Amino acid sequence: SGGFDFSFLPQPPQEKAHDGGRYYGVGLGPGPMGLMGPRGPPGASGAPGPQGFQGPAGEPGEPGQTGPAGARGPAGPPGKAGGVVGPQGARGFPGTPGLPGFKGIRGHNGLDGLKGQPGAQGVKGEPGAPGENGTPGQTGARGLPGERGRRGSDGSVGPVGPAGPIGSAGPPGFPGAPGPKGELGPVGNTGPAGPAGPRGEQGLPGVSGPVGPPGNPGANGLTGKGAAGLPGVAGAPGLPGPRGIPGPVGASGATGARGLVGEPGPAGSKGESGGKGEPGSAGPQGPPGSSGEEGKRSTGPTGPPGLRGGPGSRGLPGADGRRGPSGDTGRPGEPGLMGARGLPGSPGNVGPAGKEGPGLPGIDGRPGPIGPAGARGEAGNIGFPGPKGPAGDPGGHAGLAGNRGAPGPDGNNGAQGPPGLQGVQGGKGEQGPAGPPGFQGLPGPAGTTGEAGKPGERGIPGEFGLPGPAGPRGERGPPGESGAVGPSGAIGSRGPSGPPGPDGNKGEPGVVGAPGTAGPAGSGGLPGERGAAGIPGGKGEKGETGLRGEVGTTGRDGARGAPGAVGAPGPAGATGDRGEAGAAGPAGPAGPRGSPGERGEVGPAGPNGFAGPAGAAGQPGAKGERGTKGPKGENGIVGPTGPVGSAGPAGPNGPAGPAGSRGDGGPPGVTGFPGAAGRTGPPGPSGITGPPGPPGAAGKGDQGPVGRGETGAGGPPGFTGEKGPSGEPGTAGPPGTAGPQGLLGAPGILGLPGSRGERGLPGVAGAVGEPGPLGIGPPGARGGKHGNRGEPGPVGSVGPVGALGPRGPSGPQGIRGDKGEPGEKGPRGLPGGLQGLPGLAGQHGDQGSPGPVGPAGPRGPAGPSGPPGKDGRTGHPGAVGPAGIRGSQGSQGPSGPAGPPGPPGPPGASGGGYDFGYEGDFYRA
């Protein structure tokens, strides 16, 4: 504390003046070394010294391994009882669309009704006025994913044969019964791709076979399969029984032989879209691209010292359990023969809108087990201590001696200390001869206290002795003030681009607009004659942006025309805006461990600290109970980004995780190098989202061979991650070969860019019109930007299916055109078909190596001062310093009063006389 305390040195048994922990002796002549006095209180603290320089940071520690899997969580509550299955109704005629009502419970699909004849073409109305946006709806709670099913073996892919001729349409056949599901064959080598054959017509969908009830559970908790039975009335779900102990997985059965491929039959007419097929397995991963140049390593200046981190937060709950396997789906029937095309009839009457029958709501799934918590990584190496700061200013000067306190009680006799230095001999008189010993008197009363002598002059401090052994480490004191922040380090070389961040949170839906008014109906025009083929003109210059037109009112949909003949494929349109971000998929398995970076240069070694003896290890405390889940905290303010460190070599990319929902559209990222395919590991627990990393440099990877794999099963939706940083725009690809000259069309009128219209109400579906003539003309000028996404309109009447023309051979790839302006979101498409049954989930792969440790985050604010620490234990006494200069001789105090008489002394020795008797008495002479 700005000075040294020599109070532990042996002091002579003489009067002492106390001053702030320092003792000044008043000599009374040379004598033997006295007892060691008690330790004085600590001196006043000196001013704090300036901040020392920060030492270089230590190397990061190796990442830890993943811990064992956690215990399975408790079973969830039983599901709700389903309703009664509704009867299977006939399909009604399409009615006029009403206002969208509440969605009813879905019933069984009804039988398809007879297809009506197309009606006359309706008059196209004026567009209606845009409505105001409504209030956004609340996002519903997300359900828990079920248990994941086991993955089946991959089927073999045979060689692609030559394309067969297009057969004539055959008569429609009856739907066949669902055949037995064949065994999956072994994985074969991918054969060479044959020439692309003409596209066959799509057959009519077969009637799905009835789904049988689930089979009894197999031995050791394995899921069994029962025979497909007729659907019965669903009873109320029972309480979930105790979970069985999963038994060992049996060996895979022998794979049956693959049947011969029959002759291709005649192609049937194009029917309605069939059910969604089961997803195939993923194809092999392409070879890794060539690595870019390794960045040069530059050592920046040392950053400011980081605060000591507190205890880590509790790990997030693990991933949900696996979903059970789904039942078998019925096989589609054989395509029927195409019947003769009927004559167009009169438009049918509009029937009432069909209602959905009541369906059975499924029982709620039980929550899966909590995944394993990640193991704590190994501690990093201890950094080198920084250079010692300059010494602080010395403490205040020694104060004047205070008044002497009352004398304390006598201490016990201590061991004799080492003799002090010989003092200067005073002017002492000669000593006379010793007198006879007198009787020992009683101790007299204590004399009055003499006045304190003047403090002697301060001696010159001697050289410091060797430091003694360090005492035991005291308890931790309150934290000191934070040091000054050091200068920012130089920006290091740019590191390789990191993997894309998780998808951002899904935005809330926009406000629903108010209904607009319908405009007056316009007159229907007659189709004009087919124009002659014009000569294609040269590419015109881009015109200036026109004035924004007034917002038109939304018109009613005109009558739907019959599908025309298939035209030549047009040029690819501009890429639309990305959809709103869906929920992110679960964290993919960790990629293989990257190669270690170059070891940093060793910083200057600091002075060696004094090593204290190790304290006794404390007993581990009892494991605390798990607390309740607290409310979600708000995101804190992002601190300043620290300096970018030097880039190590980039590790290979890990295998792709399950696909998450579509996120917000960012600019196209840079194409990274494909990493070597690692073995897929089990999904680890979702980590805490870190701050966004710096954007990586633009790299261009070599294009790998096109893999042809079957589509893998979709994984369960993962947790929503924060929006990752936008990558730099990618480089344009090489130009392709020129395509064939397309048919010429009539020149289109260049329209002004339309204004971005508001979302309109769903229009009324018109009647189906006759197919119009196929126009031929050059492609028209580019239209304006897409408008906002509109509400889904009602489904119109299905027109008659036109004859499908033969597909022409694919032409060579044309030269890639200039990148167009990104279009706005187009109108929302019609809702898709029924969701297919989930495919069987794949098995967990081997656990991947942990990824590299990310850069350290910005320095957080200083924490609150802790409570003051307890006094440390007494340290070991230091080495004995040299004796100080002898103080001046004090003045003698006044004599005390005479003491009381002492006790009688012992009898003296005999004087040599003799005894004699006289008149009966004895006398001694």
UniProtKB/Swiss-Prot annotation:
Superkingdom as given in the UniProt entry: Eukaryota
Q: One Pfam family name from the record?
A: Collagen
Gly residues bias (residue ranges): 22-34, 271-280, 306-315, 423-432, 519-528, 660-669, 696-718, 772-782
Q: Where is this region: Disordered?
A: 1-925
Q: Where are the transmembrane segments?
A: none
- Which residues carry the post-translational modification 5-hydroxylysine, per the record? 103
Sites carrying a glycan are 103
Q: Which UniProt keywords apply?
A: Extinct organism protein, Extracellular matrix, Glycoprotein, Hydroxylation, Secreted
Q: List every position bearing 4-hydroxyproline.
A: 10, 13, 42, 48, 317, 332, 335
Which spans does this entry mark as compositional bias, Basic and acidic residues? Answer: 623-632, 816-827
- Modification note: Prolines at the third position of the tripeptide repeating unit (G-X-Y) are hydroxylated in some or all of the chains.
Q: Where in the cell is it found?
A: Secreted; Secreted, Extracellular space; Secreted, Extracellular space, Extracellular matrix
InterPro entries noted in UniProt: Collagen (IPR008160), Collagen_superfamily (IPR050149)
**Entry's Gene Ontology cellular component terms:** extracellular matrix; extracellular space
Any extra remark in the record?
A: These protein fragments were extracted from an ancient mandible bone collected in Haiti.
- Assembly, per entry: Trimers of one alpha 2(I) and two alpha 1(I) chains. Interacts (via C-terminus) with TMEM131 (via PapD-L domain); the interaction is direct and is involved in assembly and TRAPPIII ER-to-Golgi transport complex-dependent secretion of collagen.
The task this protein performs is described as:
Type I collagen is a member of group I collagen (fibrillar forming collagen).
Q: Which PANTHER family match?
A: COLLAGEN ALPHA, COLLAGEN TRIPLE HELIX REPEAT
Q: Which family does it belong to?
A: Belongs to the fibrillar collagen family.
The protein's name in its UniProt record: Collagen alpha-2(I) chain
Organism encoding this protein: Acratocnus sp. (strain SLP-2019) (Ground sloth)
